[in-house]
Amino acid sequence: MKEQNLNKYDEITVQAASDYIDIRPIFQTNGSATFNSNTNITTLTQAINSQAGAIAGKTALDMRHDFTFRADIFLGTKSNGADGIAIAFHRGSIGFVGTKGGGLGILGAPKGIGFELDTYANAPEDEVGDSFGHGAMKGSFPSFPNGYPHAGFVSTDKNSRWLSALAQMQRIAAPNGRWRRLEIRWDARNKELTANLQDLTFNDITVGEKPRTPRTATWRLVNPAFELDQKYTFVIGSATGASNNLHQIGIIEFDAYFTKPTIEANNVNVPVGATFNPKTYPGINLRATDEIDGDLTSKIIVKANNVNTSKTGVYYVTYYVENSYGESDEKTIEVTVFSNPTIIASDVEIEKGESFNPLTDSRVGLSAQDSLGNDITQNVKVKSSNVDTSKPGEYEVVFEVTDSFGGKAEKDFKVTVLGQPSIEANNVELEIDDSLDPLTDAKVGLRAKDSLGNDITKDIKVKFNNVDTSNSGKYEVIFEVTDRFGKKAEKSIEVLVLGEPSIEANDVEVNKGETFEPLTDSRVGLRAKDSLGNDITKDVKIKSSNVDTSKPGEYEVVFEVTDRFGKYVEKTIGVIVPVIDDEWEDGNVNGWKFYAGQDIKLLKDPDKAYKGDYVFYDSRHVAISKTIPLTDLQINTNYEITVYAKAESGDHHLKVTYKKDPAGPEEPPVFNRLISTGTLVEKDYRELKGTFRVTELNKAPLIIVENFGAGYIGGIRIVKIS
């Protein structure tokens, strides 16, 4: 019970039943005792004169084992009320209750040892003159005219007139309307019996006041006269006389080795019409045992039996046995009389190719019951099945079931697989502008059959056709057919209209002396596709190439490819190797000199450079020149020169001159223009172009670029004009 500050009786009545155990399995009430099943509290006596109540054990204890008894007790509200509560462990019969009054319901218990909580010490049954202070509790004292309330271990049958003290008695607080916790422990190994009594509330003590009696007390009894090879039962009693009090107890724990006999018997299932003997029927395995008496199977009697094996149903048999000490046990088993179960399943029709699970398909309507009407559908299994949903025909499924009683049943049903018609047709490849009638073209190979093998080709129709033979591509034709059973089928074929593949490749310029691989050079941008758009670049080959990057000029590369359909195509690109292509990206002057003869100097400035990191810059009017090897030019051929220039500020002229003889007289310029007249390109540079013709090649000619103001020259190119 939870500790609470409870001062009134009516407050304790609200304690939850879960705080205390239900005593009815091990106790029976006697006299004025009543048990409240809502609170699990037993009232031994009301506050009425001349009452006597007890709860006596319905079983026995094996004293070879320890036990613990814990309970909350209520001794009443009247400080001079009578008589108290006692508990005894004895060798008497089951249900024994001793002398009432001062005997507290335990006096006379055979070979018993008790513990009394006596609140009225002047009863005729109270002991006098003992050596444990029991008699000293009698008399009339200030505040205690009926003797001192006290507690301690007593013998229940040493003296037939009173309970005899076995150990030192101790005073306890008079009844005060409070609950107290009593704990009694038996230590079988050390043969020691102890008791502990504790008040549960303390709010009646004023600060600074010392209580007259202890609030917690302990008692010990060493080597009590228990016969350990014998059974002991127990009784808890209370009484009132000329004075009274309300006496109650709520048992928290009784942890002991109880020794009542035990019946063992199993539930059984019996086939309808079988002979049934409740003591010998196989599977019941009827048996009764007792710790002391041993095997009691022969003493079992059938207390009740309503089994009728002529009719299915659930019946009950109750067995009873009693040991030599009067303890008893009952056991009721369940007897189920059963017949074979039943299975219900219907014939079904399914489509060819359909997924079919006979156990779960709702069309089968599978259900099963045992003979008691319990649903056992989940226990049904497929015993056999030859169903092949890929082939039309009639098949058989056999179900089986075994119920929980061992009864068996089988059920077979028919499964008809209804097939669909089939269409056969081939994929087709066509040339552009070929004609195609999908229903009659022999290349399609169109045929249809119903599920019985009958030819229904004449019933085929074209459901969809997007073929356009004027354009290459992948197309589709869908056929459909309905047979005489109403079953339908469709067939899709692929029609490929094939054209030539295509190659994409760019004309490119390659620097003199540069390594050039036409198949992999990213400037070429080589790609190839078949007429259906599939990439076939990896299949492209070089059919021919006359490229010689050691000599400036114009060259050709011819690519070719054949697709998986055998279609072939070629592609020719032009490759130009410039005479000059100097943009100074890497800082190399590439043979350019000042007109006086020394190498030009380049400025490293990525922001000002046209390409890369370097650019030619001069703040003055300056001319630069480069000698062209005779081998890089062809006589009677036109060439184009391009200069990329940028004025530092404002605008000025830029002149380009071609001198066929470096030592010869001045020649007309290729062009002499304001820089601003050029085409605007990257980084504010202007592109200026002009052409010249090579008419003789006796000496290595000279190209002169003259910048008439401060500015930048980002690059110079010379290429042959076709």
From Swiss-Prot:
Question: Does the keyword field hold Transcription?
Answer: no
Keyword rRNA processing belongs to the record: no
GO BP term, example: sporulation resulting in formation of a cellular spore
Q: Which N-terminal stretch is annotated as signal sequence?
A: none
GO MF terms listed in the record are:
toxin activity
For this UniProt record, give its keywords in alphabetical order, as a comma-separated list. Sporulation, Toxin, Virulence
Pfam families associated with the record: Bact_surface_Ig-like, Lectin_L-type_dom
Its function, per the record, reads:
Promotes colloidosmotic lysis by binding to the midgut epithelial cells of hymenopteran species.
Protein name, as recorded: Pesticidal crystal protein Cry22Aa
Q: From which source organism is this entry?
A: Bacillus thuringiensis
